[in-house]
Regions:
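Charged, solvent-exposed alpha-helical segments that act as regulatory interaction surfaces
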Residues: 33, 116-124
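Residue-level signal for alpha-helical context at structural boundaries
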Residues: 24, 103, 125-128
Length: 142
């Protein structure tokens, strides 16, 4: 399947960042060569509904931002951890449609940043080749 690019998502914890780094490195391998459009930090901070201007970095601060800078890719968004996301999901409503909440605004920011990243990618790189799966030795499920 030809891919325009990959968006790597992580949480701020070091163990999650290590996995995100492996993901970026995988996409950048010559045999895969899928452009990385950027990184998203999920559960970046906690914001209580009654104090929307307060940010509590319960899982650490700036982890994905630092990794993105280290790897030379863009940080596309820092998605906060808020109770209303779970409540909206339970009710079948997308979090992005919650009005001017911190999470809805950041999800809209993410969408805009992904569009910008795709536009930049399409100007600077040729179309991506299809990524094919193989049955190489060691990869078999038998």
């Amino acid at each position: 399947i030809p891919l325009t690019g990959a968006v790597v998502v992580s949480t701020p914890q070091n163990i999650a960042l290590a996995d995100a780094k492996k993901g970026v490195n995988m996409f950048q391998m010559d045999s895969i060569a899928v452009p990385v459009l950027g990184m998203v930090e999920n559960m970046s901070y906690f914001t209580p509904e009654e104090l929307p201007d307060n940010k509590y970095y319960i899982f650490g601060e700036g982890g994905a931002k630092g990794l993105a800078e280290q790897m030379g890719i863009d940080l596309l968004a820092e998605i906060p951890l808020v109770q209303s996301v779970r409540e909206a999901a339970d009710a079948g409503r997308p979090a992005v449609l919650q009005g001017a909440t911190p999470v809805a605004l950041e999800l809209l920011n993410l969408a805009k940043n992904v569009v910008t990243a795709i536009e930049k990618r399409n100007v600077s790189l040729p179309p991506t080749s299809a990524v094919e799966t193989t049955n190489e030795a060691g990869c078999s499920t038998k």
